[in-house]
């Protein structure tokens, strides 16, 4: 598999949760598992960005919601994080744009997802048994967490978005 994925999981508990993300392949087509790489996530109010070897490959932003004079939500950006599910009690389709917990404390999970429906969804052949032979392992050299300041005028943090980048 020559892809990595930056994915947000948010909303209610399964099965009413949601996720969104972006795949990235190395420019030369090589397998990311063949060597160590530097992965980074920048998280600031209303936006999360993913990098591999200093290359920005994905951005997710909070949905923007406007309200009409009747107080009804309009203008929901379906490019941001939001959830839609059928309410069990009423059977109505419910849309929530306020279920993204990225303005609250949470913890980080570093994992190698190989089970469930994920392999078949992203790789037509499913799990490759050869990936688990000859002593293969999932190795992490180090994890660092930094807090970057924000520009008091713009509110932007970290300031590392590359010029010409178009977010999701």
Model-found features: residue ranges?
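GH16 jelly-roll
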Residues: 1-168
